[in-house]
Amino acid sequence: MSKPTTIAVLQKCKQEKKRFATITAYDYSFAKLFADEGINVMLVGDSLGMTIQGHDSTLPVTVEDIAYHTRAVRRGAPNCLLLSDLPFMAYATPEQAFENAAIVMRAGANMVKIEGGAWLVDTVKMLTERAVPVCGHLGLTPQSVNIFGGYKIQGRGDAGQILLDDALALEAAGAQLLVLECVPVELAKRVTEALSIPVIGIGAGNVTDGQILVMHDAFGITGGHIPKFAKNFLAEAGDMRAAVRQYMAEVESGVYPGEEHSFH
């Protein structure tokens, strides 16, 4: 039986400059498939609002939804490092964040992911002091879609320094991982090098410590708009298991994401 994957394993990957692949998972069967093929880090993302529930954003997702899918994924991948999103309006105050984090941690998560910058410092401190590990999320944060006016690249120009400052503030508050979404490669490189914690990219080029993809994008079953950073690994591989292996291999070698998947 394989040993449980911990944050220390990812920290070692960063130190040794070994890229690692992660993926979203929402149910037992796919979680088991991913674990069987060697993916040791999974995210129960609020992306399930769009991919599973059919909404046009992540905003309708509830804490109960996340807990339900977390339990299913944990059964399929008992030894993976499992991140679970706290959904929209589930962490508006530190106290609310702690209450909802407790629900998803009891459901099987190892860590909670929250979207936002320096305003979350007190929340991150409160959670980590109470043994709830935190993954930050900067750049394009889908829960803020109504503020951004759509799904747009973040961190260009002066906004890049603000994002870097936010990343450093989250790390100082105790965050142990950071997801960077849809930012220029140059900024992703600066952030990854400035932080001592592992940085996982999606639409941030191949310069981050790890990569994450929504599983539906990796299998080409997105429907409608296909994000620039996505790649259909199933098209070349022929079956799902081979597609997962190809995704991992291309991330680890730095082939994916390529220039065609990146922003500047």
From Swiss-Prot:
Record bears the keyword Ubl conjugation: no
InterPro entries, per database record: Pantoate_hydroxy_MeTrfase, Pyrv/PenolPyrv_kinase-like_dom, Pyrv_kinase-like_dom_sf
GO annotations of cellular component type: cytoplasm
Coiled-coil region: none
EC number: 2.1.2.11
BP terms from Gene Ontology: pantothenate biosynthetic process
GO molecular function: 3-methyl-2-oxobutanoate hydroxymethyltransferase activity; magnesium ion binding
Protein role: Catalyzes the reversible reaction in which hydroxymethyl group from 5,10-methylenetetrahydrofolate is transferred onto alpha-ketoisovalerate to form ketopantoate.
Record's subunit section: Homodecamer; pentamer of dimers.
The family this protein is said to belong to: Belongs to the PanB family.
Name used for this protein in its record: 3-methyl-2-oxobutanoate hydroxymethyltransferase
Phylogenetic classification of the source organism: Bacteria, Pseudomonadati, Pseudomonadota, Gammaproteobacteria, Enterobacterales
Gene: panB
